[in-house]
UniProtKB/Swiss-Prot annotation:
Mg(2+) 1 binds at D262, E275. This is D-alanine--D-alanine ligase. Residues 108-308 form the ATP-grasp domain. Signal peptide: none annotated. It is an enzyme of class 6 (ligase). The lineage of its organism: Bacteria, Pseudomonadati, Pseudomonadota, Betaproteobacteria, Burkholderiales. ATP binds at residues 138-193. Binds 2 magnesium or manganese ions per subunit. Its EC number is 6.3.2.4. Cell wall formation. It comes from the Bacteria.
Length: 313
């Protein structure tokens, strides 16, 4: 294990549940995190912000929080700002990194300005003329395309569009989840990868091979036929360089401590970054535990490592 005296952490709240579209995933993550911390002797307790006011954290003597909330206020900077206000240390990124990390539109703007490669894209606003915008977008980006709400995680409401006729309906559907919709050129030929980040751990890249069209919500949390390849099959030098770019993609957004950066490779091996995740899933289907396990780090040791990052200044 980490060698850290569990008493150093004090009373720890595991935040999970919440009110976002990812509540069920968060409940699963949180229960496992809670057990992992308790297995290490840490004084950890469950806390669902959908059921209790955050002020109770201070009132009940919590000094630290493991954030296992996904999406919504748990990942967009709001919970982070509240924890800052109450003087409670917490896992993951602060207000800025969390807010930017959940906002795919502004993430891509920052990446464009800082040289992090990301797929070409267009934005559509809720209420636009979807048919007219679809015609323009197909002319600019071609097909196939990915349509995504700007601020949902876990691939909620992400659609792959293969024909121009299907695009207006996909825009309309995505716009029910967010007022800004991202339409992104599909990067084909090299596969999907993720880089897991946890402090100074050198975690391997994971290649993701879903049984379906792409790595959607079902493939992430329900299906058992998604393949996770560790090692990922890339040459060591290329993997090292991709991990360096992934860390930069994370850092330029103001993200800190731990998370994930997802990217695609084209047929020539060029990387295009899709998004970061500042509060990754920690279910038995989730990627950080898989990456850690591949280098001999068990679940409990991983969550203690993540929590230990809150001990740093």
């Amino acid at each position: 294990m980490s060698g850290i005296d569990p008493k150093r952490f004090g009373k720890v709240a595991v935040l999970f549940g919440g009110e976002s579209a990812e509540r069920e995933v968060s409940l699963t993550s949180g229960r496992l995190v809670l057990q992992g911390l308790r297995d290490a002797g840490i004084d950890a307790h469950p806390f669902d912000p959908a059921e209790r006011p955050l002020s109770a954290l201070k009132d009940e003597g919590f000094v630290r929080a493991f954030n296992a909330l996904h999406g919504g206020y748990g990942e967009n900077g709001q919970i982070q700002g509240a924890l800052d206000f109450y003087g409670i240390r917490y896992t993951g990124s602060g207000v800025l990194g969390s807010a930017l990390g959940l906002d795919k539109f502004r993430t891509k703007l920052v990446w464009q300005q800082t040289g992090v490669p990301t797929p070409p894209f267009e934005t559509v606003m809720r209420g636009d003329d979807y048919a007219a915008r679809a015609t323009d977008i197909v002319a600019k980006l071609g097909l196939p395309l990915f349509v995504k709400p700007a601020s949902e995680g876990s691939s909620v409401a992400v659609l792959k569009v293969k024909t121009a006729d299907a695009l207006p309906a996909a825009l309309s559907e995505a716009a029910t989840h967010d007022k800004i919709v991202i339409v992104e050129k599909s990067i084909e030929g090299g596969g999907e990868y993720t880089a897991c980040i946890a402090g100074d751990l050198d975690l391997p890249l994971i290649k993701i091979v879903p049984a379906g069209e792409f790595y959607d919500y079902h493939a992430k949390y329900v299906a058992n036929d998604t393949q996770y390849l560790i090692p990922c099959g890339l040459p060591a030098e290329q993997e090292t360089e991709l991990k360096r770019i992934a860390r930069r993609a994370f850092d330029v957004l103001g993200c800190t401590d731990w998370g994930r950066a997802d990217f695609m490779l084209d047929a020539a091996g060029n990387a295009y970054f899709l998004e970061v995740n500042t509060a990754p899933g920690m279910t038995d289907h989730s990627l950080p535990p898989k990456a850690a396990r591949s280098i001999g780090i068990g679940y409990s040791e991983l969550v203690v490592k993540v929590l230990s990052l809150t001990l740093n200044d």
